[in-house]
């Protein structure tokens, strides 16, 4: 017959379940589509009006750069959209005048 090994049975291999491969079903998983909501992060620049986003201050901008050299997203940094745009622009300006590196070497 067609040269194929027909050992899978009639179900096309559906005779297996998760226990056959050492995987156990996650009984504590949340319902599908439900997200965990943590505490709302407050934008540090909205909370303290004295703080200024300045591209000439690389120590303040390093907080918003990941270990790999990428800009940290809003959901992690806690910035509002307005200040996240300003932080991103400041990081780009600081990189262009060599105050911050474009890449991080390991």
Curated annotation (Swiss-Prot):
Could you name the Gene Ontology cellular component terms for this entry?
Answer: cytosolic small ribosomal subunit
In its UniProt entry, what is this protein called? Small ribosomal subunit protein bS18
The record's region (Disordered) falls at 1-39
- Source organism per entry reads Sorangium cellulosum (strain So ce56)
Q: Which family does it belong to?
A: Belongs to the bacterial ribosomal protein bS18 family.
The UniProt function text for this chain reads: Binds as a heterodimer with protein bS6 to the central domain of the 16S rRNA, where it helps stabilize the platform of the 30S subunit.
Family matches, as InterPro entries: Ribosomal_bS18, Ribosomal_bS18_CS, Ribosomal_bS18_sf
What GO MF terms are annotated?
small ribosomal subunit rRNA binding; structural constituent of ribosome
Name the UniProt key words of this record, in alphabetical order. Ribonucleoprotein, Ribosomal protein, RNA-binding, rRNA-binding
Q: Which PANTHER family match?
A: 30S RIBOSOMAL PROTEIN S18, SMALL RIBOSOMAL SUBUNIT PROTEIN BS18M
Tell me how this protein assembles.
Part of the 30S ribosomal subunit. Forms a tight heterodimer with protein bS6.
Report the record's Gene Ontology biological process terms. translation
Q: Where is the signal peptide?
A: none
